Amino acid sequence: MSKRRLRAGLVGLGAMGRHHARVLKALDGVELIAGADPGGDPHGALGSVPRLPDVESLIALQPDYVVVACPTAFHESVALALAEAQIPALIEKPLAHDIPAARRVVEAFESRGLVAAVGHIERYNPALQSMRSRLEAGELGEVFQVATRRQGPFPNRIADVGVVKDLATHDLDLTGWVTGAQYRSVAAKTAHRSGRPHEDLVTVLGELDSGVIANHLVNWLSPLKERVSIVTGERGCFIADTLTADLTYFANGSTRTEWDAVSAFRGVSEGDMTRYAIPKREPLTVEHETFRDAVDGKADAGIVTLRQGLRAVMVAEAVLDSARSGETRPLALV
């Protein structure tokens, strides 16, 4: 918890901004001093907290930090204004609308030595945090594959990016995070089925530098809302459902056979299933606590760095480029 009461601001009061406002108003050690959005406060998220018309008005109040939850197209301009004013920022994902913009944001904050982070919220999901800890402890043995499914109905809140940058960035980031590896290459196909200008479906095949194969299915076309990550390894598989924050382990069975013809071709068999008991705190609250602590001087707070956010944008751009060209796109390792 913060040693002092930090004064926080918020830019963007839309579908995601309202949740940030709710958390900020209840966050220990933090006071939400104002929210800025030229479009008003359509969800009434601020309550009695003042609403301002723009980021410049918010900067004039000299907040200790600002949360950026405006549309992706404005992330760069808002972030650069905050960096110029020496104000730390928690920026919603994706970091920026393209790679050059993301690089400019990284440079602006790093060159000034400012605390800044990207809101890749899945890193704070208790199911994925538990999965990552267990993978690091070697409970699955060698990891072979990561497969994710993230689908649901079209969200009216999204207008300036497609499903790759809005949703698939979750899976692209979490895959590298839980495995501790980087994408070496990606191949992708996209579709436009809803009549909107951006893609609403993507399937991605990726290879990580560790040799792990990744598969991602993401769309805005399904009546079924699903958020599932499956990691398969030599001892079985973990399944994380980030909607319910449940983590389940399916162990490989060990069934002996004396039938040589079967034994020679036998693969894995189904073993025990374990559903872990995990404390289930809201990921957005944990994300805010983590950033608050970083602003307050905690060196190992566990924020998602801007460079990690830049990497997610780079992988997302490679996915879109592959879908356009029909070719597998390599990614430089960093």
State what each model feature region is.
Residues 91, 116-118, 240:
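Hydrophobic residues in well-ordered beta-strands that form the structural core
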Residues 1-47:
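N-terminal Rossmann-like dinucleotide-binding module
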Residues 34, 65, 145, 213:
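Short, Asp-centered acidic motifs that coordinate Mg2+ and/or phosphate
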Residues 73, 96-158:
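A contiguous active-site-proximal alpha/beta segment in oxidoreductase catalytic domains
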Residues 155-224, 228-230, 307:
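Rossmann-like dinucleotide-binding domain that binds NAD(P)(H)
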Residues 20, 49-108:
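Beta-loop-alpha module in the N-terminal Rossmann-like domain of NAD(P)-dependent dehydrogenases
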Residues 1-2, 65-67, 290-334:
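C-terminal helix-rich "cap/oligomerization" subdomain common to oxidoreductases
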Residues 121, 235-303, 307, 329:
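C-terminal glycine/acidic-rich active-site capping loop/insertion
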